[in-house]
């Protein structure tokens, strides 16, 4: 069985759905969109209810459920590496936090050779193009894009406001928009949720429009085996369909675009013969092109939870009790409101821990309940927590294919906490978080410190806690990086070096991870590269001003000084 299309896109995730939608806007352009997972079933509360975000991570219907190799600096733990499987990709199972990154991230990219048009003001128009924000457009936000963005509303949980106020009382800035003029500071957090309280995945925002077009063919339960080449040109793919794993070949007249994410994109390239020659030869994979950077430069965000008991009955603890959940579900299902309609990450912030950081190196998510991100180990009392993680770790990992079998997961090593900077940032972060949590704004709510526990104080004690309890923020990236150096995999338009008709477009092509969550940047990158593929002029550069810290102090004087950081 053989088919022919203009473009074949491998992976119907945050980038793939964006590209499929934009490419088929052009009359007569045909696209085959392949997805290894299934549909995004709209009646499955596990993926559609924002508050149920932990459920998809607990199974394998929507989650690839990768695990790392034993991490050498984390007591040899095999750590979670959840990735979305199904229409929407990781936007189908993520935490729905709409965070774009810091303007300085993109200005940093633009200083790299070949990436001059990736500055913040070049990228901002594409963030706006993708977005519809519920309170309307402005210089930073869009009003008619496919991605529904919801802002926190009056009357939400008082713990959100208390935690932001505590951050301000600790001496940090207040910001009204973490995606606007100034990311640095504490404030409300936007989320990818529709006006009627449903998850705004790219399957909903983009594919709901595009799938009506006869020029778009979507095949689910299609596991791509390899990219097919004639010489150095990609001419198609071979994929396995359904439980019977029927082998199908499809031809691409113009391009094969790999949008499989930071784990599966390098895995597919390597399995197809594009990657480090020594690795491929060791697995008897014929080398099509020796490209040493494929799978290297892997980055992620690591985070910790600092948990506190709540002395007032205002946390979300009752919503964890089974007998309260039917009413929560009914309100969400019929009205699109209530606890179920929010991801419950409605406040957060970004800070610098030391003057040598030019822009924030720590991110906070505040949550009005004490529980692990994947829904495990819920504290059986009222509580709240701060998720705290470093943003631009110098540690680098890698992804390596283990066989020719597309069903076998690759070898993944993030090499977390490999540098002294990592340890210093986390120690500082824990101590500064404790200072924030001791501010007067939280006096009415703050009980005992549940985790790490007030007895954990010395560097050695903190390091032990970090090794045992730090978790992924589910932000793998940078494993097929853009650039021109010897380890770059693609150019600034996603074209694979040394090949023709082959691109990679997803979080793997980031050269350096951004400051915050990765879904919004991934969609932006796909929007920007879509214009390149279509031969369109780039959107005009934005003229919006943005904050640069410069010589500004890291923080002001705390309202309540608790000698947070040991010098």
From Swiss-Prot:
- Please give the catalytic activity noted in the UniProt record: choline + A = betaine aldehyde + AH2; betaine aldehyde + NAD(+) + H2O = glycine betaine + NADH + 2 H(+)
Residues binding FAD: 6-35
What InterPro entries does the database record attribute to this sequence?
Answer: BetA (IPR011533), FAD/NAD-bd_sf (IPR036188), GMC_OxRdtase (IPR012132), GMC_OxRdtase_N (IPR000172), GMC_OxRtase_C (IPR007867)
Record flagged with keyword NAD: yes
User: What's the short name of a Pfam family annotated to this entry?
Assistant: GMC_oxred_C
Q: What class of enzyme is it?
A: oxidoreductase
Tell me a GO cellular component: membrane
| Keyword annotations | FAD, Flavoprotein, NAD, Oxidoreductase
Active-site residue numbers: 475 (proton acceptor)
Cofactor(s) essential for the protein: FAD
**Pathways per UniProt:** Amine and polyamine biosynthesis; betaine biosynthesis via choline pathway; betaine aldehyde from choline (cytochrome c reductase route): step 1/1
One GO BP annotation of this record? glycine betaine biosynthetic process from choline
Q: What's its EC?
A: 1.1.99.1, 1.2.1.8
Q: Name one GO molecular function term.
A: flavin adenine dinucleotide binding
NCBIfam families, alphabetically? betA, PRK02106.1
What function does this protein fulfil? Involved in the biosynthesis of the osmoprotectant glycine betaine. Catalyzes the oxidation of choline to betaine aldehyde and betaine aldehyde to glycine betaine at the same rate.
Q: Which family does it belong to?
A: Belongs to the GMC oxidoreductase family.
Instruction: Report what the protein is called.
Output: Oxygen-dependent choline dehydrogenase
Species source reads Pseudomonas fluorescens (strain Pf0-1)
Q: What does the record give as the organism's lineage?
A: Bacteria, Pseudomonadati, Pseudomonadota, Gammaproteobacteria, Pseudomonadales
């Amino acid at each position: 069985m053989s088919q022919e299309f203009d473009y074949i896109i491998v992976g119907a995730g945050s980038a793939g759905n964006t590209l499929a939608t934009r490419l088929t806007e052009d009359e007569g352009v045909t696209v085959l969109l392949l997805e290894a997972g299934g549909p995004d079933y709209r009646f499955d509360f596990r993926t559609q209810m924002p508050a149920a975000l932990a459920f998809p991570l607990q199974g394998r219907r929507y989650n690839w459920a990768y695990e790392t190799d034993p991490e050498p600096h984390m007591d040899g733990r095999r750590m979670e590496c959840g990735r979305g499987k199904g229409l929407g990709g990781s936007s189908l199972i993520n935490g729905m936090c709409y965070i774009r990154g810091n303007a300085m991230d993109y200005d940093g990219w633009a200083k790299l050779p070949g990436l001059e048009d990736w500055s913040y003001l070049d990228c901002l128009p594409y963030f706006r193009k993708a977005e519809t924000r519920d309170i309307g457009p402005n210089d930073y936000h869009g009003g008619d894009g496919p991605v529904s963005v919801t802002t926190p509303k009056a009357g939400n949980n008082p713990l959100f406001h208390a935690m932001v106020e505590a951050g301000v009382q600790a001496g940090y800035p207040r910001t009204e928009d973490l995606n606007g003029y100034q990311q640095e500071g504490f404030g409300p957090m936007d989320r990818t949720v529709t006006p009627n309280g449903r998850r705004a995945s790219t399957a909903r925002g983009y594919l709901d429009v595009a799938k009506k077009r006869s020029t778009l063919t979507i095949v689910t339960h299609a596991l791509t085996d390899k990219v097919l080449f004639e010489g150095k040109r990609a001419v198609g793919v071979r994929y396995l369909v359904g439980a019977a794993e029927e082998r199908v070949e499809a031809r691409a007249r113009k391009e094969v675009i790999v949008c499989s994410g930071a784990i599966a994109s390098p895995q597919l390239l390597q399995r197809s013969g594009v990657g480090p020659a020594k690795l491929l030869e060791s697995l008897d994979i014929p080398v099509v092109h020796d490209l040493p950077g494929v799978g290297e430069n892997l980055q992620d965000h690591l985070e910790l939870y600092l948990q506190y008991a709540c002395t007032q009955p205002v946390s979300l603890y009752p919503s964890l009790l089974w007998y309260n959940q039917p009413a929560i579900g009914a309100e969400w299902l019929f009205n699109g409101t209530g606890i179920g309609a929010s991801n419950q990450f409605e406040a957060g912030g970004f800070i610098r821990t030391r003057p040598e950081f030019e822009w924030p190196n720590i991110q906070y998510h505040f949550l009005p309940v004490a529980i692990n991100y994947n829904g495990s180990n819920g504290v059986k009392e009222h509580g709240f927590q701060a998720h705290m993680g470093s943003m631009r770790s110098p540690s680098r990992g890698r992804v390596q294919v283990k066989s020719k079998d597309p069903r076998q997961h690759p070898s993944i090593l993030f090499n977390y906490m490999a540098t002294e900077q990592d340890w210093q940032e986390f120690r500082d972060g824990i101590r500064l978080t404790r200072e924030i949590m001791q501010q007067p704004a939280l006096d009415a709510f703050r009980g005992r410190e549940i985790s790490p526990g007030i007895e954990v104080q010395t560097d050695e004690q903190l390091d032990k806690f970090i090794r045992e309890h730090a978790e992924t923020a589910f932000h793998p990236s940078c494993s097929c990086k853009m650039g021109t150096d010897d380890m770059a995999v693609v150019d600034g338009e996603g074209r694979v070096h040394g090949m023709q008709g082959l691109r990679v477009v997803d979080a793997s092509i980031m050269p350096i991870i951004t400051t915050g969550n990765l879904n919004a940047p991934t969609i932006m990158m796909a929007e920007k590269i879509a214009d390149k593929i279509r031969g369109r002029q780039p959107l005009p550069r934005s003229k919006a001003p943005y904050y640069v810290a410069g010589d500004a102090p890291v923080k002001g004087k705390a309202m309540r000084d608790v000698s947070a950081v040991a010098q």
